[in-house]
Amino acid sequence: MSEQQRQGAERDLYRDTWVRYLGYANEVGEAFRSLVPAAVVWLSYGVSSSYVLADAIDKGKKAGEVPSPEAGRNTRMALAVVDTFVWQSLASVAIPGFTINRLCAASLYVLGTMTHWPPTVRKWTTTTLGLLAIPVIIHPIDRSVDFLLDSSLRKLYPSVEKPSTP
């Protein structure tokens, strides 16, 4: 859904408020991976995954509230849940988490081999790079996931009316 369409629509708790940032918790966890216990990183994935699940359930509930013939209601709800869950899982958790993880691992390795900085400085530099990369990767990943789903999963939907892009 474009920004202009969203402005005219009802405000979405999961997309238009601070709650959206919960979906990025795992990227922050990945950025801090070299400084915190692994349990903290896994907790950040739990927060992001909870956000994804809550958004998918919310979109399914909203799809069920749209007035239409009862026969298509369950299908519409299921499609909304599946589409939102898959989109959010890829765009908010899996792809950005992998990207930040690899960026931080590579930068920590490079800093370790090419500098004589103390380990603490290398780790904080890696964390800073990971945090700075988050806003840079979000929109390209979102658009790539839109393209991926439009080219695959969304072609399987039984009706012409597709769920709106998250």
UniProtKB/Swiss-Prot annotation:
Query: What's a single GO BP term from this record?
Result: apoptotic process
Family per similarity comment: Belongs to the MTFP1 family.
Record's subcellular location: Mitochondrion inner membrane
Question: Gene encoding this polypeptide?
Answer: Mtfp1
N6-succinyllysine: which positions carry it?
K123
InterPro entries per the UniProt record, alphabetical: Mitochondrial_18_kDa_protein (IPR019560)
Q: Name one Pfam family in it.
A: MTP18
The record describes its membrane topology as: Multi-pass membrane protein
Q: Which UniProt keywords apply?
A: Apoptosis, Membrane, Mitochondrion, Mitochondrion inner membrane, Transmembrane, Transmembrane helix
Task: Say what the protein does.
Answer: Involved in the mitochondrial division probably by regulating membrane fission. Loss-of-function leads to apoptosis.
Membrane-spanning segments = 34-54, 78-98, 129-149
Q: Where is it found, in Gene Ontology cellular component terms?
A: mitochondrial inner membrane; mitochondrion
Q: What is this protein called?
A: Mitochondrial fission process protein 1
Species this chain originates from: Mus musculus
- What domain of life does the UniProt record list for this protein's source? Eukaryota
Where does it mainly reside?
mitochondrion
